[in-house]
């Protein structure tokens, strides 16, 4: 067995499914994992991913006043003392001294924490470092400063002020043996820092989400599961306007057509928009349900809904919501409204998983076709993608792709500049 040291900003059971599934499935592929993670107070229940690492250490974050001296200095300095980066480094160094670690893997989002600790440990012990970047500042739209929230303004100022941190972070990414990220857009962007940049998608739990036989229903049910965030991020206008047209033309009625939201019982920004159009009777809102109950809900759905943002309103890059993978696993048809005109819409179209629509007319046409099929058979048929395409997005495949990169690094057969986009294999020299 080879040994992997993971240094991360969160880890199950609180959060961090990407690393949690890697640890679980990499063990089956010959890799033991040692984990040093920062404390995360998220309420996610990922207890099913606990216990697979050989050792797991959770470093608590320090309590502090929001604007004490350390907090202000963090604007300019790369070490995140407030989140326990020194303690993470100390524990990781102790592990390296008593265990033969083959690779160090650091995963981070905005702010690069805890990359400094991982870089220092790997460099001192002369161990290859892999950096997994889950988010980049550059993926977000450029919002005028006066339109930013207070927290966004603070993040913007910190990014401008912390030039020492920024320069050092670029060097650490360049020195890494490889970079990985969550979408082809991210991997391509990261080539500016490191030619060995690879896309490894997130995915679904193959032991929980499996192909589902559709259940006949006397109602055409569109299901949305998850947070509605803000209107700029989850814009329902195209779908609601399409429902207005179908209602006025007599194609649908509340008795045979419903749009159900799970996770936002208040209706968030969607319910007021529906009321303004006079179609609130078609919508129902429910509280969040345990993840284990989702497959049953998906089985009863005619269509699974993903809400995106109009590119002109909120131009994000490379965002692949985890909800897509759970929908994808069920093989129920997916409707993305509106098309993000990027990675998510492209994957949905190319995989045959569903539809990504850009106009009200497209939405009406799509729903009309699906309604005709439902009226004739009582169900809407799912996608018929081949097994290889389906397996591409499982967490088990994700782990095997990580392990393939690990082995290439240790064997010295990595091809500089090649992008692993999830469909092509990494070839040796």
Predicted regions and their residues:
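N-terminal subdomain of nucleotide-sugar transferases
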Residues: 1-60, 178, 413-415, 420, ...
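Membrane-proximal helix-turn-helix segments that form the acceptor-binding/catalytic region
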Residues: 113, 120-124, 137-139, 152-179
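Acidic donor-binding loop of glycosyltransferase active sites
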Residues: 177, 298-317
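Carbohydrate-associated surface elements
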Residues: 182-185, 203
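Acidic anion/phosphate-binding donor-loop and adjacent secondary structure
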Residues: 204-219
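Conserved donor-binding/catalytic core segment of Leloir-type glycosyltransferases
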Residues: 215-236, 240-241, 398
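Nucleotide-activated donor-binding/catalytic signature segment of Leloir-type glycosyltransferases, i.e.
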Residues: 256-257, 263, 268-295
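A charged, aromatic-enriched C-terminal amphipathic alpha-helix characteristic of glycosyltransferases
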Residues: 358-364, 375-411
